[in-house]
Amino acid sequence: MNYSVTTQEFMMLAAKEPVNVLDLRDHDLDESFELLEGSNVLQIPLTQLPNCLNQLDKGKTYYLFTQFGVRSKTMAQFLRNEGFQVTNVIGGTSAYQQYLAS
């Protein structure tokens, strides 16, 4: 199974069907970002996630975003070990914003 996708791969998946996004950025520092219509974005700061696992559904696949995709890669491994289906989006919201601007 592929545990990471590029922004372009993520956008192709999101264009086909609604996706579940887990935005792990600090709410005080970062603005939320908008995805394709119908996508579900859950914002939980990275530092709070271990205490918020009850908000996640093990039957869903989540695409993880941090600002640059580094911290989300580490958290993806943690969540997989906890039984969740997660995929890291390489480059995070920075790459996502660059993709939209191009």
Predicted regions and their residues:
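Short, surface-exposed ligand- or partner-binding patches at beta-edge/loop junctions that are enriched
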Residues: 64-66
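Rhodanese-like catalytic fold shared by cysteine-dependent sulfurtransferases
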Residues: 1-19, 27-61, 70-102
